[in-house]
């Protein structure tokens, strides 16, 4: 059943614009270009996206970006902005004079936005990014694996490169590798979380929207697009706060909350529509995985990958 909210209607409890959408598998999905974004856009999902903003801030010493900004009134794009929280954070706390275009397939940004914040509904799988901001000092992207057709990543990186300023334009890309890892074998032999991850990755592969993090391939695609000064950082995010390290515990607390909101939201469509699961089977697996990720004696973690790169100048 398609739900059509009134034009420019506002969800007062969340303070966000609603967009046309439909209910499926018990969740609300966006109806603009359906099938491209496989995850919900309901309140629970928007909260999940905001929680991961906190995770990434903690993982990066509370810095929303690390690229040097060398011009006054910089031009910035946030690709796949989601709720817009990163772009709003930058506009309000870091670069109040910046012009920031926040691009997403779905219109789920807040009703009240800071000066310089420009929400833009656009499909970044389009071959040309003609309507988007050019001459950018910084382009930021995170958690877009699964939202981009697997074979279109070289095209996306090329368009990022084309929209940066030569010499001083930087790109930052952050992804979570959802494959659970453990360095000391402290996790259950028949891990529900491992099973969930295997099925989720398989289902997304069958949609041709892979969520697999392949560091060497990403580096090669960035090099092929023309980037230089390519760096990659890998940060552990434990799924529960067992570590003696205070920072690791704090990242883990927030990652655990985000993960508990993520399991069902991310896996309903791939497991039901590509692997033949019933909705209740998916939810039962997710509940078992949630319980497992809250057991302190299990030392499972996921890796957060951060790529930074620069567009060289004409003489470089």
Curated annotation (Swiss-Prot):
One GO cellular component, as annotated: nucleus
Cellular localization per UniProt: Nucleus
Phenotypic consequence of gene deletion: Impairs production of beauvericin and attenuates virulence during infection of tomato plants. Impairs also growth on the non-preferred nitrogen sources nitrate and nitrite.
Enzyme class: transferase
A matching Pfam family: Methyltransf_23
EC number: 2.1.1.-
Gene Ontology molecular functions: methyltransferase activity
Gene Ontology terms: biological process: methylation; sporulation resulting in formation of a cellular spore
Reaction catalyzed: L-methionyl-[protein] + S-adenosyl-L-methionine = S-methyl-L-methionyl-[protein] + S-adenosyl-L-homocysteine
Keywords assigned: Methyltransferase, Nucleus, S-adenosyl-L-methionine, Sporulation, Transcription, Transcription regulation, Transferase, Virulence
Family according to the record: Belongs to the methyltransferase superfamily. LaeA methyltransferase family.
Stated name of the protein: Secondary metabolism regulator laeA
Organism: Fusarium oxysporum f. sp. lycopersici (strain 4287 / CBS 123668 / FGSC 9935 / NRRL 34936)
Gene, per the UniProt record: laeA
């Amino acid at each position: 059943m398609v739900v059509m909210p009134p034009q420019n209607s506002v969800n007062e409890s969340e303070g966000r614009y609603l967009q046309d959408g439909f209910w499926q598998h018990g969740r609300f999905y966006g109806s603009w270009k359906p099938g491209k974004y496989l995850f919900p856009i309901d309140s629970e999902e928007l909260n999940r996206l905001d929680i991961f903003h906190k995770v990434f801030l903690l993982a990066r010493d509370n810095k929303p970006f690390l690229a040097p900004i060398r011009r006054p009134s910089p031009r910035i794009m946030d690709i796949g902005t989601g709720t817009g929280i990163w772009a709003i954070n930058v506009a309000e706390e870091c670069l109040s004079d910046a012009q920031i275009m926040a691009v997403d397939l779905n219109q789920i940004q807040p009703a009240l936005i800071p000066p310089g914040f420009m929400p833009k509904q656009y499909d970044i799988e389009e071959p040309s990014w003609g309507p988007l901001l050019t001459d950018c000092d910084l382009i930021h992207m995170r958690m877009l694996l699964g939202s981009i057709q697997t074979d279109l990543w070289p095209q996306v990186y090329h368009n990022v490169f084309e929209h940066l300023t030569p010499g001083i334009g930087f790109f930052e890309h952050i992804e979570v590798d959802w494959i659970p890892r453990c360095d000391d074998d402290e996790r259950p032999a028949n891990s529900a979380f491992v099973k969930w991850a295997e099925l989720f990755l398989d289902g997304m592969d069958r949609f041709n929207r892979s969520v697999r993090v392949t560091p060497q391939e990403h580096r090669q695609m960035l090099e092929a697009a023309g980037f230089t000064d390519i760096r990659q950082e890998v940060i552990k995010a434990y799924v529960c706060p067992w570590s003696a390290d205070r920072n690791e515990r704090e990242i883990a607390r927030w990652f655990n909350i985000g993960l508990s909101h993520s399991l069902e939201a991310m896996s309903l469509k791939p497991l039901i529509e590509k692997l033949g699961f019933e909705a209740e089977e998916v939810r039962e697996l997710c509940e078992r995985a949630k319980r497992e990720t809250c057991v302190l004696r299990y030392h499972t973690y996921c890796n957060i990958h951060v790529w930074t790169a620069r567009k060289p100048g004409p003489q470089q």
